[in-house]
Structures are given as structure tokens and as C-alpha cells.
Amino acid sequence: MHQLFRLVLGQKDLSRAGDLFSLDDAEIEDSLTEALEQIKVISSSLDYQTNNNDQAVVEICITRITTAIRETESIEKHARALVGLWDSCLEHNLRPAGKDEDTPHAKIASDIMSCILQNYNRTPVMVLAVPIAVKFLHRGSKELCRNMSNYLSLAAITKADLLADHTEGIVKSILQGNAMLLRVLPAVYEKQPQPINRHLAELLALMSQLEQTEQYHLLRLLHVAAKRKDVEVVQKCVPFLIRNLKESTYNDIILNILIEIAGHEPLALNSFLPMLKEIAEQFPYLTGQMARIFGAVGHVDEERARSCLRYLVSQLANMEHSFHHILLLEIKSLTDAFSSILGPHSRDIFRMSNSFTNIAKLLSRQLENSKAESGRRRTGTEVSFPEKFREPKTMEPKSEDHEKLQVKIQAFEDKINAESHTPGSVRRYSLDHVSKEERKNVRFSRSRSLALNTVLTNSVNVEDGEIEGKTGMHASISLSEIDPPGHGIGKVPFKTDTHGSQLRNSSASHPSIIHSEPENMPETFKENVQEEIPEAAISPVEYQDKLYLHLKENLSKVKAYALEIAKKVPIPDQCTIEDNTRSCVAKLFFTCSLKGHYCLYSKSSFTLVSQAPQPWIQIMFLFQQSLFPEPLSIQSGSVQFLKALWEKTQGTGTHSFEVAMTESTFPQQKDLDQLQLHLEEVRFFDVFGFSETAGAWQCFMCNNPEKATVINQDGQPLIEGKLKEKQVRWKFIKRWKTRYFTLAGNQLLFQKGKSDDPDDSPIELSKVQSVKAVAKKRRDRSLPRAFEIFTDNKTYVFKAKDEKNAEEWLQCINVALAQAKERESREVTTYL
């Protein structure tokens, strides 16, 4: 063990404990296991819970050890010692005596838990950790259980088999109120369904008490259970699903579960068909899914087929065109399965009308006729049709258009026949499931390729109008689509420091302006800059100072403008001007004015490199003036700094600082628009926002303290949901894979499927260099909701369900990146 560890732990020397952070991680890495064993001895002593010195030493040492393990990536080497210390905490009291006060051993358990379970994707570590983690669900404090649940949920994404043996304990923890663990159940169900099935009724009873994300995971569990075709599960969940179907939030998900059930247990839904009809009337957009359920139930026997056909036919006449394809497929599937319902001419009904309304009328008429025959099977009886729907006996010679039409109609009929003979549980009629080749080639005419003989004649009258044969195929419709400003203004003036290189306000929230002085700067300027003279104390010669006179004349306008502009454009805390190969750029640093407990930028800063430094300098100048009741002079210290920055960026033929500020007091609107656009492009507004209450720009956490408390729970996901990930890097190849992603801890995770590459790994936030929406110039119809994540060696492209969802993902990822950076900055300064 390292000498300093031996000294601190052996003598429990709190005064030297902070020195551990001055050691290099690699220098102490070999000592970590031994140090953990020594900590276990100290924490197990009888007086540990009352000995504040020992507790402080242990806390500092654990922080140093876990930091070194993370930085050296040696978790597997020290996992056994970590888990041993973690397990020993279970022998002691973990429940707090008072509110918001953890016991000493609960603090140890929390620190160790965070270190271990952040490595949920490492199998050797999780094999040791999961059995202990499950014990904490029943023994730990409420806060500890909640954090443990978050980490176990993440572990279930990649290592569900390790949790399967503990399914019973997980279910009991959920029933005791730990609903976060519901997200684990879909992952472990296939391995251990019995414990979940035994408590399924109790789990379903929790639905009304759950939050929206927890309800979603409960429904995911039912979907997984439905696929296993367990009759007992079906009997329990169908009434529950029907009851909750009236809630529009989840009716799409619930219908997908019911479709799964209808594929293998259609009779379970038979008694609920009237209720499903009512719901379909209330939510017409569910008609396509309802049609599949009615089609599946109709295949049970002829009596149910007739009943379901009446509903499907009525929808065919009433629904919009997007549902007609699905409805016709289900109708044809039922009439093919029970040929006696329509007789031998069922095919003619589909072929002899160019109107879905007419098809529906003919089908309804035949259903009534067959019902009047008292259910007798009439396999050979000819169906009578009105004269105007009969095929003409004489046909014109077949033209080239005629042949093309025949090919299209035959292709569509073959498609219907092929799909009709596919089992209901396999058929997918949603347009989302149609292959790209089908979208390209399978097209409907105005009559949806069902008006076979009517379109072939020159002029055939129908009930709803007249169609001219000479118009051919008409317009083809594809099967595929569809106060004080700024940073908290005070009245304390800026002062220059003794080195003359920085300008800072006594209030930490005020900006500082840094200028790297050129070597050839006149000594007199340097001396003037270094003098500590309060701004208001300067007495210029009014008639010689144009800037002073101009500001005096327009002071009220300047202050009003500064007040408004500070709400739209943040004022940087610090600014440097740097030369690059082409021009000068401004490097701007922004921090949060509040610096609350969960602040994203209390120790770190948001850095922006701008190719347009002069508008920023002008905005900073206006901000400076807004701080003082009197006009600023060109001799003012802060103005001299801004002037020096301006001159460093000044191009040939451009105005001097004084001329620019007097001739154009305010930045041009196009320049402001460019600044705001740049801030949007670098996702500044994801992590900062102007607080009307505080009158200042604050970080996301400080602006949303109620969210910050939830987000900062260990392992709590910032966001989760389905995204489409682009599988091929070339733009012209549009191949996407849908995955369920979770942003939590320091990673963006996804649930792996059987077909996924085993080498696919989560995205480590520490390796992310930038995140941005797909550039507008690259956006086309396929990428209106896409964003990119850039790491040191790869670019990921994702697509959300809509632009709003994409913005939510972008903001959450940027907040997570800021959190990680802030956490790193805090750890550097801890105990030093």
C-alpha cells in the first residue's frame, strides 16, 4: 500500500487525507485493493458511527479511490474489494434517523454503488455486484433504493440475464412502491416469466398510481408477455388493456398488444368487440389497427366472420383513403376463408367498381342476401349485380394502355391474395411496414386499381359520377405517402487589476475582458491600463472626448437598448482575441450567474469561438455603459481594454473604435441575427436561458430547480425513448435501425437485439466532442428530425419521431455533457 494511504488510514490522519489528491492516479493504482480492505476494517469498528474523524477520513479516501479507479479504468481489478466493502454496509444501519440525513454506512454504500454500477456493461463486475445490489433494495434507505433502481434499470439493458435470477426480489420491491424497477421487467421476463406472472394482477393494479414513463414500461411488459402466448396471462391482461384503451396517451401501444393477442387467442377479444367499435369511433386514426383485430376474430368461425365483415364494410364506406388498403385486405381475407358468405363472385365485387363506396354497398347487399338464406352454404349460386356493374360482353381491341393496366391489376390482385393467405399474426398492413420496393412500384390509380372493367370502357356510368375511359390511369397516387440586463446587473464599477491583463468586477457575475498585449504596445498605454481608477472618477475634457459627448446625448437610449438586448444575447464573462491563419476570432466564456447547488457552470464555462468579434465587443461596450449612471469616457479603463480588443480585430479601411461606437451606436440587426444563429448552432440555448425573475442568464439546472433535483439522482435517465440510427455513413444510402435509447450516467445506451453486432457499444459522453442538428442545407424529406453526435473516431446520425422530440434529445444530451464537464471540474478542486 502506498505510504500516504498507510499513514492516512493507519493513523486516521484527517490533516493529510487531502494530500491523496496530489498523487498521480497511476502511482496509487496498485494500492487501491489494500486500501479498500483497510477502510472495511475501520468502518466495521464499533465506534465508527459516532467517530466524526474516522468518517471524514473514510469519505475522502473512498472519493480518491473511486476517482483513481475510473481514471485508470481498473474496475475489474478492484471489483472484489469494492463489492466486499459494499456488502459489509448491509450489516449496519442504513435507514436515516432524521430527514435528509444519511447514516455513515449509507454514505459509503452510495459512493461504492455509483462507482460499481456505472460499469453495468462489464460482465465480471456485474456478476459480483448484482446479488448485493438486490439486497439493498430491501435493506437500504428510500434514496439508496431509488438510486439502486436506476442503476439496475441500466444494467437490464445490456445484462438482463444477470438480473433474471433475482426477478422475485425485484417484483416484490416494485410492489412495495419502488416503481422505477418496472423498466427491468420486460428485459428479464423471457428468462424468468413465472415470478412476474404470479404477481401480474398486483402489478396491473398499480397502473393508476404510476408516472407516465412507468406506465409505458408496464405496457412494454405486457407486450413481451403477449408474445409468449400464455393463456393465463391473456385472461388477466385483456380486460385491463380494454379499460385503459380509452386513454389516448397509450391507445396505440395497447392496440399493438391486442393485435398480438388476437393472432393466437382471438376468442379472448370476442366479447370486447362492441367496446372496440366505440373506441374506434372516438379515435378514427386507430381504424387500421382495429381492422386487424376484427379480421383476426372473424377467422374463428363463419358467424363471427359475418359480424366482423359488417363492421369492416361499414368502415370501408366511411373512412379516408389511407385505411382502404388495410380494410380491403382484411375483408378479402375473410371472404376467401369463408367463401359461402359472398359465393363464387366475390372477386367480381372487388373488380367491378371504381368506388370504395360502391364496393361497400355491394358487399353489404350480398351480406344481407346471404343472411336471408338462413345460413345455408351456397357455393354454386350466381351473385346478381346491377346491369351497370356487369362486364360488357363486347370489348374493344386491347391497346398498350390496356395491357399495362392488366399487368398492374394482376399485380395488385396477386399481392392481395398473397397477403390474405398469410397468418394474421404475421401480416403487417401498416404503410410503415411496406418495403421500399413496394412503395416504388405498387401504385393505385384514382380507383385504386380496383376498377378493372369500368376503366377499360370508353364511358361507364356509376352511381357517384362518370369516368372517361380515354383518360387511362388518371393521376397516380403512390402507396407510400405522408430588468437589469445580462448577468445580474449591479452598480459596482469595473476595476483593472495590477497586471493590466484582465478586467473583472468585484461581483463574480460581471464579465471580465482579457487581452493579450502585443509586445510593441506603448509603455504609456500599459501604465495607464494598470492604474486602478474607478470609472466614475474620470473627468474628461468634454469638448475633446467625442465618445463621452455622444454617450451623454444618448445615455437613456443606450441603457434601454442594453436592457433589451441582454435578454436576447448573453454577455460573456470573459473574452480573448486570438489570431488564426485568416483573421482574428473572439473566444468567449459564459458561466451561470446563480451558481446553484446543481449548477452546470459553477466551476466550468461554456466556450464559444466567434468569427465575428466586433459585434460582441460592441455589445460588451453597451453593457459596460449600462452599469454606470454617468457616460463613459474614452480614457476609462474598461473602454481602453475594449478599444485594444477592437484594434486587434480592426481590418484595413475599417473605422476606429471611437468612430465605430459614435457613428453606429447599436449593432446592426443582421449582425445580431448572426450572433443568435451561431448561439443556436452551438446549442447554447440548450444549457442556458434568460431568467425574467433573476434578470440574468442562468444555466438549465438553475432555471429549473424542480427538474434538477430529479435529474441529479444517481443513474436517473435524463431522457429515454425510440430513435432511428443511421446504419450506413453515406448520405445517399438511407438505412435506419430503430432502437430504444436511454441517456443516463455517462453514457447513451441502447437495447441490443438478436441481430445487433455484439461489438456495438454505448456512446461514452466523455468521448463526445460535439452534438448538433443536421445542417439545414443538408436537410431533405428524409432528415427533418435528424441530429448528429461526433466522437473522436466516429459520427452517429439519429432521427427522432418529430422535430420537437429531436430538440428534446439534443437539449438533454448537451445538459448531460455539461454535467460531465462540471463534475470533472469539481473533482479536480475537491479536497485540494
Swiss-Prot record:
Superkingdom of source: Eukaryota
Region (Interaction with TGFBR1): 201-319, 663-832
Start and end residues of each PH domain: 716-818
Protein localization: Cell membrane
Main location: membrane
Keyword vocabulary terms for this entry: Cell membrane, Membrane
Membrane-related topology note: Peripheral membrane protein
Compositionally biased residues, Polar residues: 499-510
Membrane among keywords: yes
SUPFAM superfamilies: ARM repeat, PH domain-like
Function: Interacts with TGF-beta receptor type-1 (TGFBR1) and inhibits dissociation of activated SMAD2 from TGFBR1, impeding its nuclear accumulation and resulting in impaired TGF-beta signaling. May also affect FOXO, Hippo and Wnt signaling.
Assembly behavior: Interacts with TGFBR1.
PANTHER family linked to this entry: VENTRICULAR ZONE-EXPRESSED PH DOMAIN-CONTAINING PROTEIN HOMOLOG 1, VEPH-A/MELTED
Protein name in the entry: Ventricular zone-expressed PH domain-containing protein homolog 1
Source organism of the structure: Rattus norvegicus (Rat)
Gene: Veph1
